Amino acid sequence: MTHITGTLYIISAPSGAGKTSLVKALMDAQQEPQHGAQAKIRVSVSHTTRAMRPGEVDGVNYNFVDRATFLSMIEHGDFLEQAEVFGNLYGTSQSHLQQTLDEGHDLILEIDWQGARQVRAQMPQARSIFILPPTQQALRQRLTNRGQDSDEIIEARMREAVSEMSHYSEYEYVVVNDDFAGALEDLKAIFRANRLTQQHQQEQYSELFQELLA
């Protein structure tokens, strides 16, 4: 039996661009009947020292750990990448990532540009996607509508967003989230197209290709 290895997808975006909502919608869409056995996307669950927000679940949204535990994991080489954002540490488990890919699942990493650079340096075959808002004004409005942060925090997030967006050119694909449904279709198209590359088709249909050319 042919062993099919999953593909790693790096998805980055400034806070408020809709990355989390788009990834959730992508995951929901693959549960639809017409996807059947093709449904094999997983989302990596990062470790973080950030405080848990209302509605979040440990082990589902993030693996929440204290700073001492996180630093110990760095010392033991447990992370493929790690970064500090707004004073909070985030990292991706190396062993979990490799196990998921070896099982044939595509894996989504939702990380910032710093983490993306670290991952691409070690796994250049990873696909990378950057999600942009239609305008800065729209981004600011989305952050304000969340109702989670003070004006001071929102200003800090906007400065961080501009810095994050300046790295969009380092990514293979760019999705502008102006219309959510359209952006979701663009995201789906990237995954569909990647599964049709010669390399992926060779893995899936190697016996067929041999038979056709016999």
Curated annotation (Swiss-Prot):
Its main location: cytoplasm. HAMAP family: Guanylate_kinase (MF_00328). Keywords: ATP-binding, Cytoplasm, Kinase, Nucleotide-binding, Transferase. It catalyses: GMP + ATP = GDP + ADP. ATP binds at A13, P14, S15, G16, A17, G18, K19, T20. Belongs to the guanylate kinase family. It is an enzyme of class 2 (transferase). Essential for recycling GMP and indirectly, cGMP. It comes from Pseudomonas syringae pv. syringae (strain B728a). One of its GO terms (molecular function) is guanylate kinase activity. The lineage of its organism: Bacteria, Pseudomonadati, Pseudomonadota, Gammaproteobacteria, Pseudomonadales. Pfam families: Guanylate_kin. This is Guanylate kinase. SUPFAM superfamilies: P-loop containing nucleoside triphosphate hydrolases. The keyword Signal does not apply. The keyword ATP-binding applies. GO terms for cellular component: cytosol. NCBIfam families: guanyl_kin. It is found in: Cytoplasm.
